[in-house]
Amino acid sequence: SESSAKKFERQHMDSRGSPSTNPNYCNEMMKSRNMTQGRCKPVNTFVHEPLADVQAVCFQKNVLCKNGQTNCYQSNSNMHITDCRVTSNSDYPNCSYRTSQEEKSIVVACEGNPYVPVHFDASVAASA
């Protein structure tokens, strides 16, 4: 079965670079990465950075996770990300998403040995 680390990669990593101006990016990616099976996953973020750079976040700034756990980490630098949000007129199985590109700091939960990201917690605008 899929490990938590592999699930994180499937759901959140797209290192091929930014999707530029493809408005269908989220529709295509959410489907190809199996996040529209059984339901339309409401929100998902893809990170367009090398996997090693995202894994390195586990050794950066320790922050509190949204659920109160203490194993979350915030990236020291901004990363290119794409936020996918299901549209209000979206009707399963025809999941439809709005694609928005951002440059933000990311927050991930890490666990295991090796210590790697297993959950995408948030993206935050970097403080100036």
From Swiss-Prot:
Can you tell me which residues are glycosylated?
34
Q: Name one Pfam family in it.
A: RnaseA
Q: What class of enzyme is it?
A: lyase
Record-listed substrate binding positions: 7, 10, 41-45, 66, 85
Expression across tissues is:
Pancreas.
Q: Which PANTHER family match?
A: RIBONUCLEASE, RIBONUCLEASE PANCREATIC
| Name of the protein described by the UniProt record | Ribonuclease pancreatic
Q: Which organism is it from?
A: Myocastor coypus
The gene that this protein is the product of is RNASE1
